[in-house]
Amino acid sequence: MSATGDQDLIQEDQEAPVNQEGAQAEAVGDREGGDSGPDSGNTVAGVAGPMRGLGEEEGEQAAGLAAAPGGGNAEEDSEIRIVVEMVEEEEDEEEEEEEEEEERNEADNFDLVAAARRYPIRGFRMEFLDMVHSLLLRIYHNDHILIRMRGGRLMRRRRTAAPSGSEEPRLLLVHERLGVGAAGPEGEGLGLLQEAALVPEPEVPADLAEMAREPAEEPAEEASEKPTEEAAEEPAEEASEKPTEEAAEEELAEEAAEEPAKEEPAAEEESAEEPATEEAAAPEEVTKYQHEKWDEEAQDAAGKEEKEEKEKDAENKVKNSKGT
């Protein structure tokens, strides 16, 4: 019983100064409540900081100590200081965390800016569009066909124009706006593709008739030259072998030699005019069938000339036999 009684007395002695200090603090607050001096605001501001993290009892004790600094015990002062230091440490930690978060955000933003400077996607997009448009322009204007013919020559044929009802759509509206040789929005040209488009194309003969006429005229000329040479040589030999014949027979032989020579150029002119008229009628459609026709006509003309020469030779021989 004595131990418990002593403990109760000790607790009452410890609580008594606290209650007294609380009463003193209330009295001082009532006194200062009516005052409007500048010190009243400072006292309230000085007490407000420690009272944030304290309970009701600890707040009353801190207020009492602030109002009456001469009262209280050293143990209570140390406890209050510990609590205040803990609160200040927590606030410092929160401020450090906020500063770290801000630094992280700034680092992330810097990375984004560096990536945007290193990879300019806008410029790449414009360059790619310019390249595609230049390719389409090159393909759109490349409207001719190259055909390899005999003799290692190239022939150029234009495509047939589309009918008036079906018009081709216009593809390169962007280049029409910018201009074919205009620079891009960033001051850069179209590059190698633009230079390739400006290179002149090799000149190629466009007349089909001239190219087809050369291989066709050669066999016809050879066939016409051979009978003329033979016909001119034979009468000359006969005239030299028979110098004693009469003048009339010589004149007949000369006339016979001149007639085939006159007829042969006429036949050559006719044979040359016929393919020329055919070429003028259809200069764009040269086929192997026309070559075959020309060969047949040349052969027919050569056969006719040979028959005429044979008939004339037979007549001359008959005349010579009669004269002898």
Curated annotation (Swiss-Prot):
InterPro entries: CT47. Pfam families: CT47 (PF15623). Residues 1-82, 88-107, 211-324 are annotated as: Disordered. Residues 246-258, 266-277 have a biased composition (Acidic residues). Residues 285-318 have a biased composition (Basic and acidic residues). It comes from the Eukaryota. Belongs to the CT47 family. This is Cancer/testis antigen family 47 member C1. It comes from Homo sapiens. The gene is CT47C1.
